[in-house]
């Protein structure tokens, strides 16, 4: 199911066949420095992806999607919306493979996703959680019109599979506060 298209990207639901390309993107340690990694065992990731497709997309009607280059058909990253209990609005998350960073793809994708969420889902409030050392994501949030609200701790998973609590800056976006 295609969510949106931009000049350079197709934003669509993930398919099981996309998992090998995700491992290529996540193989660079700089990609997982600020986010949870994929499962170490690709078979586990495939099972997780099947369940995600069935349960998350089917129940919520949104989730994390893949970013596919319209020119090459390659998966260049992921971005999407997720429900985060205890926080206002949907969480906007994003990740790009290293070769695709600093080329405007994240802004292009996230702008389209926000527009989709506002128009198709009727969602007016969004949040994003960014590590204070992730300067590129901070710049992206600010360029998208998000404003820093406060610091918060969230549980996550390290590359070795252990649970960890990390501190993030919570950024917020309210469509009603934006000029048309």
Give the residues covered by each predicted segment:
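Short beta-turn/strand-loop junction motif enriched in small, turn-promoting residues
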Residues: 53-54, 157
């Amino acid at each position: 199911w295609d969510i949106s298209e931009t000049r350079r990207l197709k934003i669509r639901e993930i398919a099981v066949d996309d998992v090998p390309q995700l491992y290529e993107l996540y193989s660079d340690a700089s990609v997982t420095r600020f986010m949870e990694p994929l499962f170490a065992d690709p078979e586990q990731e495939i099972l997780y992806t099947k369940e995600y497709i069935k349960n998350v997309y089917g129940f919520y009607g949104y989730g994390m999607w893949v970013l596919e280059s319209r020119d090459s058909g390659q998966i260049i990253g992921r971005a999407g919306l997720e429900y985060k209990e205890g926080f206002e609005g949907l969480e906007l998350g994003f990740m790009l493979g290293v070769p695709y960073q600093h080329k405007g793809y994240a802004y292009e994708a996230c702008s389209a996703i926000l527009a989709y969420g506002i128009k198709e889902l009727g969602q007016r409030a969004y949040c994003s959680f960014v590590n204070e050392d992730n300067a590129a994501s901070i710049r992206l949030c600010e360029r998208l019109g998000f404003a820093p609200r406060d610091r918060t701790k969230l549980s996550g998973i390290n590359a070795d599979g252990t649970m960890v609590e990390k501190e993030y800056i919570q950024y917020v976006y309210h469509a009603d506060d934006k000029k048309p």
